[in-house]
Amino acid sequence: MSQSTSTLRRNGFTFKQFFVAHDRCAMKVGTDGILLGAWAPVAGVTRILDIGTGSGLLALMLAQRTDESVTIDAVELDSEAATQAQENIAHSPWPQRITVHTEDVRQWVPRQTARFDLIISNPPYYEQGVECATPQREQARYTTTLDHEALLTTAAECITEEGFFCVVLPEQTGNTFTQQALSMGWHLRLRTDVAETESRLPHRVLLAFSPRTGECFSDRLVIRGPDQLYSEGYTALTQAFYLFM
């Protein structure tokens, strides 16, 4: 392996079918994004929108999970992250299926002529407080650039009637987000509470909303078993992606 390739591998995350470099992105590859990309329902989808794609992780995971006819639009406001996402996608098996748009999604969505049957986002969830090291990090971590109401409104403008809008959030933030979504006419259809171990309280929640009403299916996912190895449930969900699972 060349020195440049070795450096690249240290600045990113290697999955079974693709590599994600993230050294120019404010938010790195992490468990939240991997959970969301593996969990989001993809049956029957034809058009996917990834809001705030960052390194392109979610777009790449969804490309792996769907067939060749599915197209994915990935929108990212930060130009450095968008460029890195484009590079990651160009080196993946699916460069023709994913298009990166360097733009504010609120300006991009009104120009679209077709709706999406899956919209996905790993959104910011911190209120502005402690100052971040860079404006890019602040944009990725705080809700000041695209708050949750604006995110819900934007998704509602471009989703199909049967579509799903999926997010991952901290447990308490997710509960607040859900109440806000319900008040805006969304319906909660899927919810998975995520705990690190069986004995711990959930710390993350995976949520899928739809414009159409219907039964809400809820479950719980534990990441690690008593032996601190990945649980059967987490392994089943993510083993198509993790290199050594």
From Swiss-Prot:
Specifically methylates the adenine in position 37 of tRNA(1)(Val) (anticodon cmo5UAC). GO terms for biological process: methylation; tRNA processing. It comes from the Bacteria. Its EC number is 2.1.1.223. This is tRNA1(Val) (adenine(37)-N6)-methyltransferase. One of its GO terms (cellular component) is cytoplasm. Keywords: Cytoplasm, Methyltransferase, S-adenosyl-L-methionine, Transferase, tRNA processing. It holds the Pfam family MTS. Disulfide bonds: none annotated. It is found in: Cytoplasm. Its main location: cytoplasm. It catalyses: adenosine(37) in tRNA1(Val) + S-adenosyl-L-methionine = N(6)-methyladenosine(37) in tRNA1(Val) + S-adenosyl-L-homocysteine + H(+). Belongs to the methyltransferase superfamily. tRNA (adenine-N(6)-)-methyltransferase family. It comes from Citrobacter koseri (strain ATCC BAA-895 / CDC 4225-83 / SGSC4696). Transmembrane segments: none annotated. One of its GO terms (molecular function) is nucleic acid binding.
